[in-house]
Curated annotation (Swiss-Prot):
Gene, per the UniProt record: Oas2
Organism of provenance: Rattus norvegicus
GO molecular-function term, one example from the UniProt record: double-stranded RNA binding
Root EC class: transferase
Protein name (record): 2'-5'-oligoadenylate synthase 2
A Pfam family assignment: OAS1_C
A cellular component annotation (GO) from this entry: nucleoplasm
Positions where N6-acetyllysine occurs in the chain: K408
Length: 733
């Protein structure tokens, strides 16, 4: 370190000192019409939602040429300090808003992190940073160009970098580089961080600047439009600072940036998103600070014991919790006093946005991760965050009634085709819908579809006809309809989004034409046998048919199989579906996961064989389903509620089905539908996620008392269902 280093005082910085709040200057008016100039002079919360994007471009985004000049000025400072032998700069990294490329027009913040070879460990930074700041200050003030722009306040050294129209208040930070040669942090890095913090009694997050390289990398992967949304949130926050008497803590600005990233990641992940939906979602999250718990596992995870213990300690801290994705000790969301003020302001802006048309709903984002929900709180989690309320369900019902009325009375009125019946399917009909998931399935049984063959060959033309009629009639019905583009040449389903004045938000629909295989006597076991016999004969004659090809014909049976179950079991199904959605989001590139219906059936199976009671423990049920997913290679699950082994043709077919490659999960409504699918889907990815979830707080009653799964066989045999048939394979637990 040099002979002069040991003589320095050991009293160091108490962490990143607070930056002074900068009063936001008036926005520059750019290309605004006379009647729009007021937009740049008013509170952002008063800007009409349809004008927000224009407002960002005209008032918040800095000029690119100005930023280039700022970069040149900052690079000049870097070069000057790198040339100073006594500072021993190994590497310079730009941080703060400047480094994250979330700079607001006019004035913004930034850091210049100087990784120095003089600091060999975290403790050195704590001991000697102030002395090194003295040296840097002297070097800059000795330069004619910088002596007037350098300011020193205790442990804070700043340089004002300004050009006409843009300025950056740059904080200079000599720092230890824990990454050294490696670009990615190992668990050892975070172990050293925790040990060093304990030794020198450092504050949480005090060494977060050491990870500025990771922070910069974390933000650079996100699209420019997301950074536009971040600018909007930051500008709103800056305007609020002018209203508050006490300056808010600087980490709060970073917390809002991270919260905006979280909202986009969890709810959208598309580059060309709607800014209004984005800001609604962020405001919705801000308005519930006592529920906020946000973190990432990009740079650290739960695998190492030291890191895991620290991470779980942080995640179980009082809300709000927003962890720095590069430093697990740094909760940038703490300080509930200001969050309450923010929550009130966010709700006020949210209410004003709701008055603007068209209404753009929030993305489906929860304020806290499911992973850290304690086992005893799972039922409350389901009720608060997953179970839809009556208003939502009535909304869906009204939308379904609109489409059903159109199909029955209008769509085929000028043809000989009759609508035999319309069945409401999907999660809404089964009673397992999730909050904010405004979708509905409608199955329309047509007289002209009188066989499985006719359904196979003609359904695409009826999809086109329904679309044609809906397009023609939407004005008469005062509807707004946006059709999804099908990737299939001959689509089996018509997917569209419905908007109406009678609906508070848009609703997504799937309409499927179907053959009425069960007829009006669907409760008659004989009619089901006939329908299944025809289906099996068709499969025997056509090798190209995939299993479940005609499952739409048995939607009523699928619906009734789930809908009649206890309310608490349907809550567990919601929990499993939410878990599945989280797994789905993590898959990059998108993987072909098993259908959600397979997980629903597995949940019912786990409950039937593990509990069977209305008052079961939700954590135990959840744990059991994950255990079955982990053991997917052994799974063989089926039911005999709608078909069984008694009839010869059915018995032979079922014995063939259950001898297929695992996993096998037969649709209880359609014996040809194996939603387990063997190798068809990526069960191994789902199993990997399930294993990682075993360390979740959901399964911890006490530190050394994990929740245990129910004892459920992974293999269902004909004998276990009461059939007098020698088991194909033995039951396995």
């Amino acid at each position: 370190m040099g002979n002069w280093m040991p003589g320095w005082s050991s009293s160091g910085s108490l962490g990143v000192p607070p930056m002074p709040v900068q009063k936001l200057e008036k926005s520059v008016q750019v290309n605004l019409e006379p009647d729009e100039k007021c937009l740049s002079q008013t509170e952002v919360s008063s800007v009409p939602s349809q004008k927000l994007e224009e407002y960002i471009q005209a008032n918040l985004k800095p000029d690119e040429e100005s930023l280039k000049q700022i970069d040149q000025a900052v690079d000049a400072i870097s070069d000057l300090l790198c040339s100073e032998v006594m500072i021993d700069v190994l590497k310079v990294v730009k941080g703060g808003s400047y480094g994250r490329k979330t700079v607001l027009r006019d004035c913004s913040d930034g850091t210049l992190v100087l990784f120095t070879g003089l600091f060999k460990q975290f403790q050195d930074q704590k001991k000697y940073q102030d002395k090194l700041l003295d040296l840097i200050e002297q070097r800059l003030k000795s330069h004619e160009k910088y002596k007037k722009s350098v300011k020193r306040k205790l442990s804070l050294l700043e340089v004002q970098v300004s050009i006409p129209g843009q300025s950056i208040l740059l904080q200079l930070l000599p720092t230890f580089n824990p990454l050294c040669i490696s670009e990615n942090p190992s668990a050892q890095v975070y172990q050293n961080l925790k040990r060093s913090m304990d030794q020198v009694k450092a504050s949480p997050g005090e060494f977060s600047d050491c990870f500025t390289t990771l922070q910069q990398r974390f933000f650079e992967k996100y699209p420019g439009r997301l950074k536009d949304l971040i600018l909007l949130v930051k500008h709103w926050y800056k305007q609020l600072q002018d209203k508050w008497i006490i300056p808010s803590p600087p980490p709060l600005l970073y917390a809002l940036e991270l919260l905006t990233v979280y909202a986009w990641e969890q709810g959208c992940q598309t580059k060309d998103f709607d800014i209004t939906q984005g800001i609604r979602t962020v405001l919705q999250l801000i308005s519930q600070p006592t529920n906020l718990c946000v973190y990432w596992l990009d740079n650290y995870n739960f695998e190492d014991e030291t890191v895991r213990n620290n991470l779980l300690h942080q995640l179980n801290s009082p809300r709000p919790v927003i962890l720095d994705p590069t430093d697990p000790t740094n909760n940038v969301g703490k300080d509930d006093r200001f969050w309450q003020l923010l929550a009130e302001e966010a709700q006020e802006w949210l209410n004003s946005l709701r008055l603007n048309k068209p209404h753009k709903p929030c993305w489906d984002v929860l304020p806290m991760p499911f992973f850290i929900t304690p086992s005893h709180c799972l039922d409350k989690f389901i009720k608060d965050f997953l179970q839809p309320d009556k208003v939502f369900l009535n909304q869906i019902k009204r939308a379904v009634d609109i489409i059903c009325s159109f199909l029955k009375e209008t769509c085929f009125q000028n043809s000989d085709i009759k609508v035999l019946k319309i069945i409401k399917g999907g999660s809404t009909a089964k009673g397992t819908a999730l909050q904010q998931r405004s979708d509905a399935d409608i199955i329309v049984f047509l007289s002209s579809l009188d066989s499985y063959d006719s359904l196979e060959t003609e359904r695409s033309q009826y999809v086109q006809e329904i679309r044609k009629q809906l397009e023609a009639c939407q004005k008469a019905f005062n509807l707004g309809v946006k059709f999804d583009i099908s990737k299939w040449m001959a689509p089996r389903v018509l997917s569209f989004t419905l908007e109406s004045k009678s609906l508070k938000q848009s609703v997504e629909f799937d309409v499927l034409p179907a053959y009425d295989a069960l007829g009006q006597l669907r409760s008659d076991y004989t009619s089901r046998l006939k329908a299944y016999k025809k289906l099996i004969e068709l499969y025997a004659s056509q090798d190209s048919l995939k299993g479940g090809e005609f499952s739409v014909c048995f939607t009523e049976l699928q619906r009734d199989f789930i809908e009649t179950r206890p309310t608490k079991l349907k809550g567990l199904i919601r929990l499993i579906k939410h878990w599945y959605k989280q797994c789905e989001r993590k898959m990059k590139p998108k993987a072909s996961l098993p259908p959600k219906y397979a997980l629903e059936l597995l949940t019912v199976y786990a409950w039937e064989h593990g509990s069977g009671t209305d008052g079961f423990d939700t954590a135990e049920g959840f744990r059991t389903v994950l255990d079955l997913v982990i053991r997917y290679r052994q799974l063989c699950v089926f039911w005999t509620v709608n078909y069984n082994f008694e009839e010869d043709h059915m018995r032979k077919f079922l014995l063939t089905q259950i001898q297929k490659k695992r996993p096998v999960i037969l649709d209880p409504a359609d014996p040809t539908g194996d939603v387990g699918g063997g190798d068809r889907w990526c069960w191994h990815l789902l199993a990997k996620e399930a294993k990682e979830w075993l360390s979740s707080s959901c399964f911890q009653v006490e530190p050394k008392s994990p929740v245990q799964p129910w004892k459920v066989p992974v293999v269902q045999t004909p004998g276990s269902c009461g059939a007098q048939i020698y088991p194909v394979v033995g039951g396995v637990y």
